[in-house]
């Protein structure tokens, strides 16, 4: 697991950092022990995910909902909790946001290592229907200039 970016943070332990943290306003650093698992895993796919993490590191944040239930990244979670104590998660506040962040993670994984077309691809094809349902995510904490009068 040499490709994992991790360091020690006081009060958190060993933190595993994703490479691509696109929507920083939605990131939350959580200890693995504070995240609730709601879905099972499949041994074969877990091995595929483990091999990808060994090759590339952790590419994307996992996704939790407003109740800190893991909604995307179960296989990554199972692999990573043996490598550290905490990581960054996207915090989704609705089903639409869970779907969007989950699709974003798939897209990041597909585009890696060339992320130059990420924003363009988010608004194309099957990704567009997810992005259109959560336009507020793209403007959170963005300063909006007042129009000149």
Residue ranges and their predicted role:
Residues 1-92, 101-115, 123:
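Short, charged/polar connector segments at secondary-structure boundaries
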Residues 112-149:
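Alpha-helical interaction elements
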């Amino acid at each position: 697991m040499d490709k994992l970016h991790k360091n020690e943070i006081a009060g958190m332990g060993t933190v595993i950092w994703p490479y691509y943290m696109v929507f920083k306003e939605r990131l939350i650093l959580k200890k693995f022990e504070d995240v609730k698992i709601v879905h099972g895993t499949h041994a074969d796919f877990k091995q595929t995910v483990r091999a990808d993490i060994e090759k590339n590191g952790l590419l994307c944040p996992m996704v939790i909902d407003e109740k800190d239930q893991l909604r995307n990244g179960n296989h990554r979670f199972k692999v990573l909790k043996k490598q550290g104590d905490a990581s960054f998660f996207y915090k989704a506040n609705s089903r639409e946001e869970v779907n969007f962040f989950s699709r974003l993670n798939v897209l990041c994984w597909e585009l890696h290592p060339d992320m130059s077309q990420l924003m363009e691809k988010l608004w194309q094809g099957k990704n567009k229907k997810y992005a259109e349902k959560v336009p507020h995510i793209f403007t959170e904490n963005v300063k909006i200039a007042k129009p000149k009068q």
